[in-house]
């Protein structure tokens, strides 16, 4: 892949210069969608089970890159999260994410998963850790979840960067969804699209390729 803006690649590397590990995160959340074919008028009469401002995290996929080993993936984990506003997943959500009702029914709360994530990340934090996601949605969703649950935000205290922004800056291209960006780079997509751990893993592979480019 040809790097169109090497100055932006250098800026990305400089941003990460003082950290050893980069955490690649992808969330899945409760959601619903209008049935296909509805007119705008019909959509007004159709009640969604989950509105956009009611979405809650149900999966946290996390992949750790070691920047001292060429941005190699050195660890990964996923956690399901039990939603509280809309505890029953919609058929649309289950079809999109392949997450089953039993997965979230048996999961911890947002705050319990936050604590588990903190414990998992402790060894990496000791040597320097930042986190990234594809876009700003994940950071905003975690903040909304924390406010709703009256608890500390997941990944609180860690600096965040938007990998999607760095991708389009480095390539001087239009902003893309994650899977098209991965495949445009020449990487074969691995796993299920819209599953947190699979998306995080593919994000980690792409970010590693970007950092090693040029």
Task: Label each region the model flagged.
Residues 27-30, 48, 97:
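Ser/Thr-centric signal marking residues that sit
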Residues 35-63:
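A short alpha/beta connector and helix-capping loop motif
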Residues 51, 105-109, 191:
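Short, surface-exposed alpha-helical recognition segments that flank or form part
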Residues 95-116:
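Metal-dependent phosphoesterase signature
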Residues 1-42:
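N-terminal accessory regions of nucleic-acid-interacting proteins
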Residues 10, 43-45, 50, 82, ...:
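Hydrophobic alpha-helical segments with strong N-terminal bias
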Residues 25, 107, 133-135:
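Short His-Asn-centered micro-motif
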Residues 2-6, 15, 20, 55-99, ...:
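Metal-dependent phosphoesterase core characteristic of DEDDh/y 3'-5' exonuclease domains
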